[in-house]
Amino acid sequence: GIVIINTCGFIESAKQESIDTIIRFSEAKEEGLVDRVYVTGCLSERYKDELKDGIPEVDAWFGTRDLPRLLKTLKADYKRELVGERLLTTPAHYAYLKIAEGCDRPCAFCAIPLMRGKHVSTPMEDLVKQAKSLAANGVRELILIAQDLTYYGLDIYRERKLAELVRRLSDVDGIDWIRLHYAFPTGFPMDVLDVMAERSNVCNYLDMPLQHASDDILKSMRRGITQEKMDRLIGDIRNRVPEIALRTTLICGFPGETEAHHQDMLEWTARMRFERVGCFTYSHEENTHAFKLEDDVSEEVKRKRVEAIMEQQAGISYELNQKFVGTQQRALVDRTEDGIW
């Protein structure tokens, strides 16, 4: 048989996991357990030449936009499997719908533009068609994702079209929930909040990675925004949709981050009271703008700062969730296990 390994090359731990998987299946090929090994995805896009030399057992390497070449390489039987309906890796009732590929933002810490290229929006007609197909197969929740939802439409329609897309997807029969992930703060199209308020199947939820709160670090990260502007944006969002649940992600230990910068972020997250926060240690990635800077915060300090943010946030999330005690809420059940749903 053929093994196709879809890799990630975003941060060091993901790269190592991908390489370990490639080596494992290369050894399986040497033992006669598989016939061919193909590697695709971000790691292949970013390090193809180096990996070719280091792991010659791989039969072919494909980049992030090489699906046509991959299909051409495969025999007809395998090709039919790849171009047919989606095989969901999520529970059957929800699916991720990727509305764009690539990113035009200049964030200093991020290697995605190197691997995924410029932002390319998927035409609305194609996305509506995908949504109808997913709904026909039992999907009830669509989670819209992209490296940058905010930019959707600017490249192919010459204007931001996220609101129109969400409205059209909400018209698809059978879709009960639509959720928005990964919206960039700068230039966020506020009209999408009007759709959120109007449509009962568009969740009052927004995932907007803000990454830091200190103006010094935001500038060094090349985020194009200040703490004051983020405060104003979050206030405007909550005014438009008072019941909205906001999630953000933050990075601890970016080059030059001092204890004062960290305390600034702690105080800011306490004041913002996000419903959810994800916090990660900075990963020093080659070929990014930040790689020129000294990775001067120790791994131990990075971890402690993440723990401080997440410990504080656990208390905030708990307090915010108390308003739901004693209420009835609609839910989708992922699984049941020993009387637990």
Where are these regions (language model features)?
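Cofactor-cradling patches in redox/metallo enzymes
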Residues: G1-K72
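Conserved SAM/AdoMet-binding glycine-rich loop
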Residues: D35-G41, R46, L51, A136-A260
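N-terminal [4Fe-4S]-dependent radical SAM core
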Residues: W61, L67-Y96
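Canonical Radical SAM [4Fe-4S] cluster-binding loop centered on the CxxxCxxC motif
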Residues: A92-E125
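Conserved, mostly hydrophobic/aromatic
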Residues: C107, L127, L144, L180, ...
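Conserved alpha-helical substructure of the radical SAM core
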Residues: R116-I143
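C-terminal, non-catalytic macromolecule-binding modules
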Residues: R240, A260-I309
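Terminal RNA-binding accessory module
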Residues: K292-W341
